[in-house]
Amino acid sequence: MATLTETITSLAQPFVHLEDTINSPPVKETIRPRNDTTITPPPTQWSYLCHPRVKEVQDEVDGYFLENWKFPSFKAVRTFLGAKFSEVTCLYFPLALDDRIHFACRLLTVLFLIDDVLEHMSFADGEAYNNRLIPISRGDVLPDRTKPEEFILYDLWESMRAHDAELANEVLEPTFVFMRAQTDRARLTIHELGHYLEYREKDVGKALLSALMRFSMGLRFSADELQGMKALEANCAKQLSVVNDIYSYDKEEEASRTGHKEGAFLCSAVKVLAEESKLGIPATKRVLWSMTREWETVHDEIVAEKIASPDGCSEAAKAYMKGLEYQMSGNEQWSKTTRRYN
């Protein structure tokens, strides 16, 4: 198999004629920071953790997508590499089993890439695009091997089911909920923060991240145990969504002015709260940062209650709750460093 460096070099050849890559300076010289660096987040009591195989898995997964995804230009290749999708997955799931982390990296990477495609589509076209991918993911329909999004998803889900059918199938429906939320017309009419957070729980893919974490860690819970985690997961979804929105706002605001009026429509907690409260964008971000730290405190309180409860708390449940904490702290670390937002 070619090394990642060899793959990048070979990919660059078809694009050397493109104006935007001729004599272009290194990436670090072309990146213009979008985020307001004068806004300092309040201190957190948490620390992030990254999966120990991050470098190895990132090279493997990035190499796979460089060979199979149809990037339109070498600039798009550099943007993809700068986003570090496998790194965020390893930050989301640092406790994943060594032989499962690559599955999670592949799934989140292809979903990020599909999200970028949808940004340039109408809701109707995006819905049709996703509806084609859903039965392929289930294994009910064979993929068109000329379309990377189809065969990548098909092969990935088949390999996940071969590894652990029960837990892989538990990830399916949450993935579809996430995909449907991407083209939900409700995002055009959200003007209240509470309504937004309810919608965003689907759009941020919280159920997907939770199910994928259980798959990656090999955790099995009864229906009652899963139900008992709902409040913790809902709280986690709010924190994840808002941290993501704070860091991605400037990039998404820019995209809303240049992209498709529906696919790139700006739907963000920053925008919603700014309009609702009549605060400026920097002030709104500061308010939202305070809210994220309060949700972290709520998480710690719920965890402490569960551990101290008379019914006790299994080691699997403790690992899962710690995993949710790492999702939040890992998401913040990635969001403030990825070139996707900065």
Curated annotation (Swiss-Prot):
Keywords: Lyase, Magnesium, Metal-binding. Gene3D superfamilies: Farnesyl Diphosphate Synthase (1.10.600.10). Induction: Expression and the subsequent production of PR-toxin take place under static culture conditions (oxygen limited), whereas no expression of the PR-toxin genes occurs under the strongly aerated conditions required for optimal penicillin production. There is a negative control of the transcription of the PR-toxin genes by the penicillin biosynthesis gene product(s), or by a regulatory peptide encoded by a small ORF inside the penicillin gene cluster. One of its GO terms (molecular function) is metal ion binding. One of its GO terms (biological process) is isoprenoid biosynthetic process. CDD domains: Terpene_cyclase_nonplant_C1 (cd00687). Its EC number is 4.2.3.9. SUPFAM superfamilies: Terpenoid synthases (SSF48576). Its cofactor is Mg(2+). Pathway: Sesquiterpene biosynthesis; aristolochene biosynthesis; aristolochene from farnesyl diphosphate: step 1/1. It catalyses: (2E,6E)-farnesyl diphosphate = (+)-aristolochene + diphosphate. InterPro entries: Isoprenoid_synthase_dom_sf (IPR008949), Terpene_cyclase-like_2 (IPR034686). (2E,6E)-farnesyl diphosphate binds at residues 340-341. The keyword Chloroplast does not apply. This is Aristolochene synthase prx2. It comes from Penicillium rubens (strain ATCC 28089 / DSM 1075 / NRRL 1951 / Wisconsin 54-1255) (Penicillium chrysogenum).
